[in-house]
Design a protein with these regions (language model features):
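Glycine-rich beta-strand-centered segment in the early N-terminal region that forms part
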Residues: 23-39, 52-100, 139-142
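NAD(P)H dinucleotide-binding glycine-rich loop of Rossmann-like/cofactor-binding domains
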Residues: 56, 94-175
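Short Gly/Pro-enriched turn/cap motifs at secondary-structure boundaries
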Residues: 23-24, 58-64, 116-120, 126, ...
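Cytochrome P450 core scaffold surrounding the K-helix E-X-X-R motif
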Residues: 44-50
Length: 357
């Protein structure tokens, strides 16, 4: 196996990523080395590269947390995988597994977690290290490029929909029909929910209808809230906000039903006003949701494996990463962008077929 690999490296916040040769990492105890076949590009990667959030990654680092690939090597003590197994590497690299959150199945809020492509190097590279207990098993025959977005956009929206506690036959409103929103619509429909989509762009509203939304509403319309209340018979039982827009957060509280739940995923800067009287009187629950647990990830992958969820993707080589970031900033990306490595994502996985030479 090669000793060096190509990677897109952040050396300065807010500056273009540098494509360079770096050493192939060596898996330690309990770790696996994954040969990256495809890696999705997420807004979180852009935030990481820009240094937007209060706790910043340590420079230099390699972003990327929607990794689909095959096991290339095993670290000491790993017995659950073998070379050539198709695996996914998601945002949650590992967690302590000892705190009250981990012990109750909430490793996503562990204060000692590490995150792929943020606090440890990610998948904008030919190889990446994964903690074996947190690597997701992918189905044999998987399309690597197609499954990559499920490892973040998929599990994030699936978990957030579960957090609304909406039941089959009830309504959810999904605000923001971009890379996350169009996937969320498909999960919602697969879960037996009716969907009202909210966005400000005509092309995104068209995407929402194509994905299965029963109604699609322009958020800027003076009648937007009234239209949703009427269509849903009094408001959505759950509202999922993926939009990176504070006004979308405020609008969500106006379209949710009494005793409904608003699940927040988007991470715009700043704050949003909360109508305390309405929240109290109508018993509205406002809940943040961050990615998903290992169980959530397995469930999200299962929906996709059954063909019930399929992200709209466009593929590009690693060398295009700075152009992709520029398009993300400008809001010019419809669906999800996925980096492919040496066209490897076009090869379907078979047992042993993709093991390293």
């Amino acid at each position: 196996m090669a000793k060096m690999m190509k990677a897109a490296v952040v050396r300065q916040f807010g500056k273009p990523l540098v494509i360079e040769d770096v050493p192939v990492p060596v898996p330690g105890p309990g770790e696996i080395l994954v040969k990256v076949m495809a890696c999705g590009v997420c807004h979180t990667d852009l935030h990481a590269a820009e240094g937007d959030w209060p706790v910043k990654p340590s420079l230099p680092f390699i972003p990327g947390h929607e990794v689909a690939g095959v096991v290339a090597a095993l670290g000491p003590g790993v017995t659950d995988f073998k070379p050539g197994d198709p695996v996914g590497v998601a945002w949650l690299h590992d967690a302590c597994m000892r705190c009250e959150y981990c012990e109750t199945g909430w490793e996503t809020v562990c204060e000692h977690q590490h995150n792929t492509g943020y606090s440890c190097d990610g998948g904008f590279a030919e190889y990446v290290i994964a903690a074996a207990p947190f690597a997701a098993r992918l189905p044999v025959g998987v399309d690597f490029a197609q499954v990559a977005p499920i490892l973040c956009a998929g599990v994030t929206t699936y978990k957030a929909l579960k957090e609304t506690e909406a039941r089959p036959g009830e309504w959810v409103a999904i605000s923001g029909i971009g890379g996350l929103g169009h996937v969320a619509i498909q999960y919602a429909r697969a879960m037996g929910l009716h969907v009202a989509a909210i966005d400000i762009a005509p092309d995104k509203l068209a995407l929402a209808r194509a994905a299965g939304a029963e109604i699609a509403v322009d958020a800027r319309s003076a009648d937007a809230v009234a239209d949703i209340l009427k269509a849903t018979g009094g408001g959505a039982h759950g509202v999922l906000v993926t939009a990176v827009s504070p006004p979308a957060f405020s609008q969500a509280l106006r379209v949710v039903r009494r005793k409904g739940t608003v699940s927040l995923v988007g991470l715009p800067p700043g704050e949003f006003p909360t109508p305390i009287f309405d929240v109290v009187l109508k018993r509205i629950t406002v809940r943040g949701s961050i990615v998903g647990t290992r169980r959530d990830l397995d469930e999200a992958i299962a929906f996709a494996a059954e063909g019930k969820v399929r992200a709209e993707i466009k593929t590009a080589p690693l060398s295009d990463i700075n152009t992709i970031f520029a398009n993300l900033k400008a809001g010019k990306v419809e669906g999800r962008m996925v980096l492919e490595f040496a066209q490897a994502a076009k090869v379907r996985s078979e047992p042993g077929a993709l093991a390293p030479a």
